From Swiss-Prot:
One of its GO terms (biological process) is tRNA methylation. GO terms for molecular function: S-adenosylmethionine-dependent methyltransferase activity; tRNA (5-carboxymethyluridine(34)-5-O)-methyltransferase activity; tRNA binding. Belongs to the methyltransferase superfamily. It holds the Pfam family Methyltransf_11. Keywords: Methyltransferase, Transferase. CDD domains: AdoMet_MTases. PANTHER family: ALKYLATED DNA REPAIR PROTEIN ALKB HOMOLOG 8. This is Putative methyltransferase NCER_101265. It is an enzyme of class 2 (transferase). Its EC number is 2.1.1.-. GO terms for cellular component: cytoplasm; nucleus. It comes from Vairimorpha ceranae (strain BRL01).
Length: 244
């Protein structure tokens, strides 16, 4: 496998089907809600790394930044939370002024407004393999169904290492990947070993399917303690903290 699979079977998929995919992803899973209820606090700075259509973004508590590679999915977020009469509330700026970014970085800021009083977060188009933030920046990181889209062991490792780098020593990560046990469903087509294509409409998406031990071992190898793990929504989740 190589990164060309991601271009052909991940990026092109989300570019073509962003709006159709958006309407299928609208609920926050129970474990995500309970995790944030415990760990998210006012004054925290948090990252949704691979935020997709933003279903986990509108929250009380800390300040949230949503990062995704797909500009089409980011536009879905803007379309949902910035109504026509609230377009003035969509602004641009540079997060380097907030002393969290490594360089000048443009972003979109969705403010609270009359039609979306509960919404206030930043949106950035970026790559989870090279997060554009300073080290030890975030109190919470969400990585929900993201790293299984990276098509080589090296790239999946790099994604874990980048989250480790930008997480504060006291921070937590909630990470989900699809469970290998789902491979028996008819929508899965094996390429080889644990590499699969999954049909949505008329287009295939690429996934690497983890088993529980493999995910836990990968997290520990890359500098994390696994505080909790389990299964939810056909996925494996882990709650991570940096090893001391």
């Amino acid at each position: 496998m190589n990164s060309e699979y991601e271009d052909a079977y991940v990026h092109k998929f989300y570019s073509k089907y962003a709006k159709k995919f958006d309407v299928t992803r609208y609920k926050t899973w129970p474990k995500i809600s309970s995790f944030l209820k415990v760990y998210d606090k006012p004054g925290f700075l948090n990252l949704d790394a691979g935020c997709g259509n933003g279903r986990n973004l509108p929250r009380t508590g800390g300040v949230w930044i949503g990062l995704d590679y797909s500009k089409e999915l980011l536009n879905c977020i803007v379309d949902k939370y910035c109504k026509v009469n609230d377009q003035k509330d969509l602004d641009c700026g540079t997060l380097s002024k907030k002393n969290i970014c490594k360089s000048e970085l443009k972003y979109s800021l969705v403010h609270k407004s009359s039609s979306t009083p509960h919404v206030s977060f930043n949106l950035i188009r970026g790559d989870c393999l090279c997060l554009p933030f300073n080290s030890n920046t975030f109190d919470i990181i969400l990585s929900i169904a993201v790293i299984h889209h990276f098509s080589t062991p090296e790239r999946r490792t790099q994604a874990l290492q980048e989250m480790h780098r930008v997480l504060k020593p006291t921070g937590r990560i909630l990470l989900y990947v699809w469970n290998e046990e789902t491979k028996f469903q008819s929508k899965f087509k094996q390429i080889k070993n644990k590499d699969y294509l999954v049909r949505f409409k008329t287009f295939d998406r690429y996934y690497y399917l983890y088993d529980h031990k493999e995910l836990v071992d990968a997290c520990v190898k890359n500098g994390f303690n696994v505080e909790e793990s389990g299964i939810e929504q056909e996925s494996i989740f882990v709650i991570l903290k940096k090893q001391i």
